[in-house]
Amino acid sequence: MKISLTNRVRTTIRERKLFREGNRLVLVALSGGADSVALLCVLRELGYETVAAHCNFHLRGVESDEDAAFVEGLCRDLDVPLHRIDFDTVRYARERSISIEMAARELRYEWFGLLRKELAIEYVAVAHHADDNAETMVLNLCRGTGISGLCGMPYKRNDGIVRPLLDATRDEIEAYLLDQKITYRTDSSNEDTRFRRNLVRHRIMPLLKELNPSLQEALLRTRENLEGVAAFFSKATEDFHNTLRATASISIREVKETPAPFTLLYDLLHPYGFNRDQIREVVTSLDNPPGASFFSSSHRLLRERDRLTVLPLSPKMEVPELFGLKIGDSFLDLPDGKQLSWQRGTPADLDLEGLRLPNTKLLLPLAFVESLQEELGVRRPQRGDHIHPYGMKGCKTVSRFFIDRHVPRRRREEAWLLCQGTEVVWIMGYAADRRFAIDELSDTEEYLLFSFEL
């Protein structure tokens, strides 16, 4: 017997303990699309008192305003209190050199948090469903992820975000709306495959379903299996986390006695801002003499005689300042008088001479730069920086790269790095990271050509 959407959501709320017992007031993120409209209606059916929150990101011209008008009308008809806000999403993304998708996400969740406190509402219900979660699992797999990433979206977050539709499929949601004769808005940008999620939805998922027509069920089983693994792993590492929180250090001997020191240390140190390459170097240091230090943006890790100690950075130990890039500009003046400049255009528009060895020039796809989820910026080197040098095999620290190239210490200290978050993209004037290299140019695609002279 096919379960109704309302009963499915009721079961999810009960089994996943989404709401504290006795709490019937919920803030619903209401875009006007099928998923959020169904979520609002189902929660009302289940007896929850709902308040709606609508974001107008002004990304689709008149369509965005029509969405807002639809939401206002729906809430008026249902007698649901509505709070709405307008965002200049494009400007926000440009100022922070992040993708439109990431900008909208940051703006949305920041406002939800503020509104939740203002209205004294404990939970914010968002309308992600099972198909969204399957797409997230595939996206995370393509990016490279761990157990939690392969589990997809959590049903409940610590900041009050809950996902009551996460066990329901898109087909079930649309069937419910059709049966109840409920209208909704359709977002035309959902068909735009320039956005990564849409690319996965419209191209990759159909191909995967050719391999396995029961892909949705297979991914659900995978998620359930991995949730069990994640719970088991969390329990196994609980003592290490408690010790690190209580003493700011952990025993090197105990780490080395575990079957997977890197996996353990990644789980322990990633929350402090250390990246995978740094943590690999930490693992290597376990078999070396004490004294090594590693830096994240907020913490310092010391390899002492028998312990690893994690300390917050003091003002005297600040990591190098990051100078953010605004892609809409054409240059960045650096404090030492040097300048990083860039041009935008197709290959025919750009002077690509000398690009074969990317020392003073670097070429990146414009779409890639715009889609970066972390800030692209320029800073000085810091301990633990790694690079996969273009034209070479393997990975090495930036300091080892300079030593191998016989670069004088003064020149090393004066070097500049182009970075995406914690990843080194380019030792400016020396070498690019091959992971960001372009294998084949497209005559029609736009690129950014960066130039820097030592």
UniProtKB/Swiss-Prot annotation:
Subcellular location, principal: cytoplasm
Binding site residues for ATP: S31, G32, G33, A34, D35, S36
Domain of life: Bacteria
Pfam families, sorted: ATP_bind_3, TilS_C
SMART domains: TilS_C (SM00977)
InterPro entries cross-referenced by the UniProt entry: Lysidine-tRNA-synth_C, Rossmann-like_a/b/a_fold, TilS/TtcA_N, tRNA_Ile_lys_synt, tRNA_Ile_lys_synt_N
Entry protein name: tRNA(Ile)-lysidine synthase
GO biological process, one term: tRNA modification
Substrates-to-products reaction catalysed: cytidine(34) in tRNA(Ile2) + L-lysine + ATP = lysidine(34) in tRNA(Ile2) + AMP + diphosphate + H(+)
A GO MF label: tRNA(Ile)-lysidine synthase activity
Record localization: Cytoplasm
A cellular component annotation (GO) from this entry: cytoplasm
Function: Ligates lysine onto the cytidine present at position 34 of the AUA codon-specific tRNA(Ile) that contains the anticodon CAU, in an ATP-dependent manner. Cytidine is converted to lysidine, thus changing the amino acid specificity of the tRNA from methionine to isoleucine.
Domain notes: The N-terminal region contains the highly conserved SGGXDS motif, predicted to be a P-loop motif involved in ATP binding.
First-tier enzyme category under EC: ligase
Keywords of the record: ATP-binding, Cytoplasm, Ligase, Nucleotide-binding, tRNA processing
Gene3D superfamilies to which the protein is assigned, alphabetical: HUPs (3.40.50.620)
E.C. number: 6.3.4.19
Family of the protein in this entry: Belongs to the tRNA(Ile)-lysidine synthase family.
